[in-house]
Amino acid sequence: MSNSNSSKLTLIPVMIAFFTMGFVDLVGAVSNNMQEDFGLSDSAANFFPSLVFFWFLIFSVPTGMLMNKIGRKKTVLLSIIVTTLAVFLPLFDSFMPTKESQLWLMYISFSLLGIGNAIMQTSINPLVTMLVKGHLASTLTFGQFVKAIASFIAPLIAAWGATTTAPILGLSWRILFLLFFVVGMIATLWLGLTRIEEEPIEGKASGFVDCLKMLGSPIILLSFIGIMCHVGIDVGTNAVAPKILLERLGTDGDSLSKFEYATSLYFAFRTLGCFTGSIIMRKLNIRTFFTIIVLMMALAMVGFVFGTEQWELWAAIALVGYGNSNVFSIVFSQAMLSAPEKKNEVSGLMIMGLFGGTIFPLFMGFASDAAKASGALYPQVWAAVVMAVGVAYLLSYIPKVKQ
């Protein structure tokens, strides 16, 4: 077998690993189902996405150190094992004696999901660079597409499980965890049995101090905040879009599960944006494209705040999904280009910025709960306003994008 064919076959289990990376996006759909099952407030339900993304702050840089010690394949394998364990635990919540113990089991599960994803986000791209000598960008884009498939189907499976008249094994929306557990086991075994020759890693991994020192560079600091806003808007939309639809379009007796399709709509347009964006950026000025997609996101925020018709809200979800799909790659590349001699430090710092997914859902929950307490007709408007602050920051970032 030629080296080319061997490399392509080796990429298959790595792409399945990208699929397991998408498990993290089940957090939005699942937190909505949990809010109904456990009677949680908005701020309590939004704590779960925050819990997942908090671990990016803690584990991104240590993962770089770990890769130097045990290698990239073993690090990715570890991340899959942790992620698979995370989706395995909720299958046992029916054995917990109280609602409180069930809730604590979910806290542990979501923490492991965040830890596994933080390790994987940091380690899987370097692993791909060893397997692909040409067309690296297109390969990574395809990996993001595979990840987006998991993101896209997660809310659909959860909604189907919650509403089906013949619940499988009595799991309801938890059927999602069972299916993802099976995929996680396949990914673990396949990658574990796949032989990958790793090149020696020279130099030492970046430490926390090295990364934090890079914040002294204005463009890196601004990019770090930009990454936080991107992920915050991503996680926030994932969590709040069904609530906005229920609030504006729902009738008495409707539940969140009826509007879970909103999350899949978001990820469908995000997936579309990944592919078309990679093509458009080859022909269109990067700053111009960035301006267009951020303006799309701004228009989406207007729709979330003022929209009352179904088409207006669907359009808002589609616009923010498409617009936000390419923000990370552009902001990340701007930071990398600003300090090409410090790629490890910049990369670790940008991944740490993913903990923006912690901050936004918390403030969104606080805002909507406060609005409910004051008797507001549409309390989720204020959750959308929090996301709009992130979009406003990205608008201010436009002049920093190099032509």
Where are each of the predicted segments found?
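Extracytoplasmic gate region of multi-pass secondary transporters
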Residues: 27-29, 216-264, 271
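C-terminal ends and interior cores of transmembrane alpha-helices
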Residues: 81-99, 296-308
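Extracytoplasmic
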Residues: 9-40, 125, 237-245
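Intracellular juxtamembrane helix-capping segments at the cytosolic ends
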Residues: 119-133, 325-340
